[in-house]
Amino acid sequence: MTALLELKQRIKNLYSQYEIYILPVLRFVLAMAYFIWINTNMGYMKQIDNIFIVLILALICSILPSGVMIFVGFALMVAHGYALGIEVAGFMLVLILFMAILFLRFSSDNNLVLVFTPLSFGFSVPTLLPIGSGLLCNAFSALPAGCGVIIYYFIRFIRVQHKLLENPDVAIADKLKLLTDGIVQNWGMWITVIAFIAVILLVNLIRTRSFDYAWRIAIIAGGVVYVLMIIAGGFYFRLDIDAVSYTHLRAHET
């Protein structure tokens, strides 16, 4: 245990000494991963689905405040949505503004959690996100985490339905109804949102207590609660828990 504490202190000292160089590099890597994820899962506008565009945007984000990365990502999403249709871009923009006004403005110090959330799904480690946020951030990180889950599921929904959404013969009203249902009736998404928020609040509550092994207990409790909530939610809504984000999406294709 003493060796771990010494290693932690050395890392802190190294970081404080070279922070001016380390932070831009970390922001660049994170922005690159986030923008590549967006282009990989959307990629409808070929002009911005380009590694050189991603590199330029990531370089810009590396020298600017971290919040810029979030809004650049939003801009990419809206642009890709516009390639499918003006109604898709408009719906995406309204959804983003809704989240920014009602939720993200209260958690500005933790909003990078929104970037990490879809990446955690992309790397197939979603359980680590709420546990890590509860350990390293405050309780308000539950807001961007929940928003990140919605962004992830909505992008995956658009990916499944993009043929229908870009079809000019489909009425705009029908497309808007489809998009609305993709949010409101996506029970797999809402199960995950609730699980993320509950785990972050629980882990943060335990972690901030003064008893021994609080961190270890918080990690174990968070993992157990997450798994139980996902399984219980999947059982209640009769979803295939191994593919909870796809079961509901496929229902819209029929």
Question: Where in this protein do the model-derived segments appear?
Answer:
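Generic multipass alpha-helical transmembrane bundles of integral membrane proteins
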Residues: 121, 130-239
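Membrane-helix interfacial "entry" motifs
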Residues: 12, 16, 20, 46, ...
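Hydrophobic transmembrane alpha-helices
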Residues: 20-74, 80-81, 90
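Conserved small/polar residues in nucleotide/adenosyl-binding loops
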Residues: 247-254
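Structural signature of hydrophobic alpha-helical transmembrane segments
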Residues: 46-48, 84-94, 189-194
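Membrane-interface helix-loop-helix junctions at boundaries between adjacent transmembrane segments
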Residues: 74-144
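Short, Lys/Arg-rich, polar N-terminal cytosolic tail immediately upstream
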Residues: 1-16
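Membrane-helix interface "capping/anchor" motifs
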Residues: 61-71, 102-111, 136-142, 207-217
